[in-house]
């Protein structure tokens, strides 16, 4: 695979690369690059996470040595699953199982547990050094990476450790690339700034889009005056808002019901969850999407790329109901092997029930 091909694969469907020039230089160096994503085991896996899962798959295929950090302690600090570490660890196992059955070759991933990292005194020394090189105001601004607002830091002082831990994860693992959703931008920018002060390697940040919740843009009125990345974090699909999300363990019928009830105004692309599912989840997996229609309405039509489909939708050539039916059909095809895998393992069924009762913000 050429450098241009690797670059195209790595950047496909990314919301932001900081910076593209630095990424190209790293690829041109011909050194084996190391990347990572850290995930909080915080509940059921919804389809929004498939966006970064696909990007992990892309990075592995592009020859990047990827680390998957099971951020158990981070989830504990963030009060996920009621702060129950045993349940958090179960959720981590479940998440890795989903990633595997999505099609990521987990044998090519370096899977790291935060539980192991925090046992090392060098790790905590690094956390302190990072904190010493960041202002308190900057740390508090970065709390949005946890789904928290700056003022919420007063609730529990441990929250202030979180951003320094995330930056330390990056330095401790000696990474070239940090992958995350756009809600992780503040942490990655903090890592880049602190790297200069500490003489550490400056990461390239790859930010994937946050999938808007099924309610779409209907909640935009509450986001006035917020920064763009914070707006996207506010309206994203969230496991703590089950009505806004499709979970990978949902039945075929539930997926169809949720898709058919989702926000999808005729001719509108902005904050349209159905179009986003097609763009970020379905088209990266399939070469085409078929819209089945009665012959009275033009008959079946196929689209080989997302841009062509979006244009047709904006121009009113595709009805929302037809779009939703096609989306539900393709999405269920993607989710079927994941569902079957989870059904084959009773421990995951029991865990899903426990997690469903324990999901916190």
From Swiss-Prot:
It is found in: Cytoplasm. GO terms for molecular function: ATP binding; tyrosine-tRNA ligase activity. Pfam families: tRNA-synt_1b. It comes from the Archaea. Transmembrane segments: none annotated. Its EC number is 6.1.1.1. InterPro entries: aa-tRNA-synth_Ic (IPR002305), Rossmann-like_a/b/a_fold (IPR014729), Tyr-tRNA-ligase (IPR002307), Tyr-tRNA-ligase_4 (IPR023678), Tyr-tRNA-ligase_arc/euk-type (IPR023617), Tyr-tRNA_synthase (IPR050489). Keywords: Aminoacyl-tRNA synthetase, ATP-binding, Cytoplasm, Ligase, Nucleotide-binding, Protein biosynthesis. L-tyrosine binds at residues 36, 162, 166, 169, 184. It catalyses: tRNA(Tyr) + L-tyrosine + ATP = L-tyrosyl-tRNA(Tyr) + AMP + diphosphate + H(+). ATP binds at residue 239. Belongs to the class-I aminoacyl-tRNA synthetase family. TyrS type 4 subfamily. Homodimer. This is Tyrosine--tRNA ligase. It comes from Saccharolobus islandicus (strain L.S.2.15 / Lassen #1). The lineage of its organism: Archaea, Thermoproteota, Thermoprotei, Sulfolobales, Sulfolobaceae.
């Amino acid at each position: 695979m050429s450098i241009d091909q690797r670059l195209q694969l790595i950047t496909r469907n990314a919301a932001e690369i900081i910076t593209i020039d630095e990424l190209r230089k790293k690829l041109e160096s011909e050194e084996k690059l190391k990347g990572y994503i850290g995930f909080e085991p915080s509940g059921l896996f919804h389809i929004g996470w498939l966006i970064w899962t696909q990007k992990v798959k892309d990075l592995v295929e592009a020859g990047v040595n990827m680390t998957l950090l099971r951020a158990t302690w981070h989830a504990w600090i963030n009060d996920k699953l009621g702060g129950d570490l045993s349940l958090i660890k179960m959720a981590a196992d479940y998440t890795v199982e989903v990633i595997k059955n999505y099609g990521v070759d987990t044998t090519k991933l370096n899977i790291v547990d935060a539980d192991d990292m925090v046992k090392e005194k060098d790790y905590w020394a690094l956390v302190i050094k990072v904190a010493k090189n960041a202002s308190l105001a900057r740390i508090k601004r970065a709390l949005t990476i946890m789904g928290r607002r700056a003022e919420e830091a007063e609730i529990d002082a441990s929250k202030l450790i979180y951003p320094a831990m995330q930056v330390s994860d990056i330095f401790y693992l000696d990474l070239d690339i940090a992958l995350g959703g756009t809600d992780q931008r503040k942490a990655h920018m903090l890592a880049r700034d602190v790297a200069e002060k500490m003489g550490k390697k400056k990461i390239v940040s790859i930010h994937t889009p946050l999938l808007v919740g099924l309610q779409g843009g209907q909640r935009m009125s509450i986001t006035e005056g917020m920064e763009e990345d914070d707006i996207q974090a506010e309206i994203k699909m969230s496991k703590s808002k089950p009505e806004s999300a499709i979970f990978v363990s949902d039945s075929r019928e539930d997926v169809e019901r949720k898709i058919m009830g989702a926000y999808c105004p005729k001719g509108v692309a902005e904050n349209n969850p159905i179009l986003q599912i097609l763009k970020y989840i379905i088209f990266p997996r399939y070469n085409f999407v078929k819209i089945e229609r009665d012959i009275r309405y033009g008959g079946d039509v196929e689209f080989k790329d997302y841009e062509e489909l979006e244009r047709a939708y904006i121009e009113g050539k595709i009805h929302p109901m037809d779009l939703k039916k096609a989306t539900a059909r393709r999405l269920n095809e993607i989710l079927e092997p994941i569902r079957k895998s989870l059904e084959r393992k009773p421990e995951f069924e029991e865990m899903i029930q426990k997690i469903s009762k324990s999901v916190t913000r």
